[in-house]
């Protein structure tokens, strides 16, 4: 089970000095917490710890204990910390179960990959106040599977994933938010259904259109290059606040990396200006981007068409999401497939799927269900090298 704790914007911390934050105290198994709606929840086993908070299995209060198959988790942070408070704002505005269900019904979707918000509140323990949020439980993240598959997904898998991500982006955009950091490590599989993918990490999501008024295009040198450097949008490189077109541009870069295992500017991620200039150069000539990334003759034309469509969007323009989905659906048709909702997360080998990888993946899913703790991101267990790399290349825009 993997749940991401929000991160503090690295660049901001560098300018102002690190904010003083406190670690969360351990909650006891079986402890009862009451949310703002007066609903009681029971805390289960701890399954991970972020930089300043803890994550536990959770379920509605009953006479029994919280089992290893609990459907929810609870994130806990000291109430004077900021990241969870920021994430809560998104969930309260845009992720209530009834909102998501209404969208699924009116748009005739099988599901929507936005985590559901089940409740939140403050809990006093030993004279200290803690903020908590109840949310869905998830399985493995896509980055781990991508790396296990030799950093490559099949064309069908990439198109299926991207269709579901477009569904997600349309929803959060219509609710006045942009994500700004779409990438494999922020995409988690459903705990019960490995064919469903969810976009997480809204701790620093940006409200681009409060009360229906779009933020104006404004370059801020202090915000230059915010985001995950290899994927972030050209707008973000220029210090402009995230917008809808930026999310779609980021998805385009993700699709290319998932198909090929690399992006043309990954040879020099330490130089953000080089990365920005490379993206600008390739945006002006999408054909050259395709030639660079797909040197073989059989290029995925739908990717080029998608990128060409996205680059024409103005900063405040509302995308035509169905047009973008239609482009990807044409790609599925071109390879003799269709949108069947199946995510076959295995690598292509000689035109076929590696049976060993498929078997291994099914086994991993079953083990994850049994343990409930696999793939939990724990900041305290990351290697020093990983932490240093992320601090150099992964910054987020804070609302």
Residue locations for each model-derived region?
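Juxta-kinase regulatory segment immediately upstream of eukaryotic protein kinase catalytic domains
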Residues: 2-38, 44-45
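Protein kinase glycine-rich loop
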Residues: 44-50, 55
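ATP-binding glycine-rich loop module of kinase domains
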Residues: 56-100
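Conserved structural core of kinase catalytic domains
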Residues: 104-156
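Activation segment signature within eukaryotic-like protein kinase domains
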Residues: 161-162
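Catalytic-loop of the protein kinase fold
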Residues: 173-191
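Activation segment/activation loop of eukaryotic-type protein kinase catalytic domains
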Residues: 188-226
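Conserved C-lobe activation region of Hanks-type protein kinase-like domains
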Residues: 192, 234-296
């Amino acid at each position: 089970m993997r749940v991401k704790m929000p991160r503090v914007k690295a660049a901001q911390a560098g300018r102002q000095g690190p904010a003083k934050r406190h670690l969360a105290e351990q909650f006891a198994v079986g402890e009862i917490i009451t949310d703002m709606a007066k609903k009681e929840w029971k805390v289960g086993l701890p399954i991970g710890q972020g930089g300043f908070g803890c994550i536990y299995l959770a379920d509605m209060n009953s006479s029994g204990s919280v089992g290893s198959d609990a459907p929810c988790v609870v994130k806990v942070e000291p109430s004077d910390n900021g990241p969870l408070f920021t994430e809560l704002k998104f969930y309260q505005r845009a992720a209530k179960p009834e909102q998501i269900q209404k969208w699924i019904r009116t748009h005739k979707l099988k599901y929507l990959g936005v985590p559901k918000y089940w409740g939140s509140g403050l809990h006093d323990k030993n004279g200290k106040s803690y903020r908590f949020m109840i949310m869905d439980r998830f399985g493995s993240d896509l980055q781990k599977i991508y790396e296990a598959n030799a950093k490559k997904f099949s064309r069908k898998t990439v198109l299926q994933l991207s269709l579901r991500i477009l569904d997600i982006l349309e929803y959060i955009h219509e609710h006045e938010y942009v994500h700004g950091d779409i990438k494999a490590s922020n995409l988690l599989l459903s705990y019960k259904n490995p064919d469903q993918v969810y976009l997480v990490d809204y701790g620093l999501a940006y409200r681009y259109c409060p009360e229906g008024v779009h933020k104006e295009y404004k370059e801020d040198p202090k915000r230059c290059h915010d985001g995950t450097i290899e994927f972030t949008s050209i707008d973000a490189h220029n210090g402009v606040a995230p917008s809808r077109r930026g999310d779609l541009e980021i998805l385009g870069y993700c699709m290319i990396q998932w198909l090929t295992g690399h992006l043309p500017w990954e040879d020099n991620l330490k130089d953000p200006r080089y990365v920005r200039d490379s993206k600008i150069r390739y945006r002006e000539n999408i054909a050259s981007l395709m030639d660079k990334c797909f040197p073989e003759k059989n290029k995925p034309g739908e990717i080029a068409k998608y990128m060409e469509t996205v680059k024409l969007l103005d900063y405040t323009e509302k995308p035509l999401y169905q047009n973008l989905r239609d482009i990807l659906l044409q790609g599925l048709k071109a390879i003799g497939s269709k949108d069947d909702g199946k995510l076959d997360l295995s690598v292509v080998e000689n035109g076929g799927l590696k049976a060993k990888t498929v078997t291994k993946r099914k086994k991993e899913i079953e083990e994850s269900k049994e343990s409930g703790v696999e793939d939990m991101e724990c900041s305290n267990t990351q290697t020093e090298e990983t932490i240093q790399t992320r601090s150099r290349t992964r910054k987020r825009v804070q609302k």
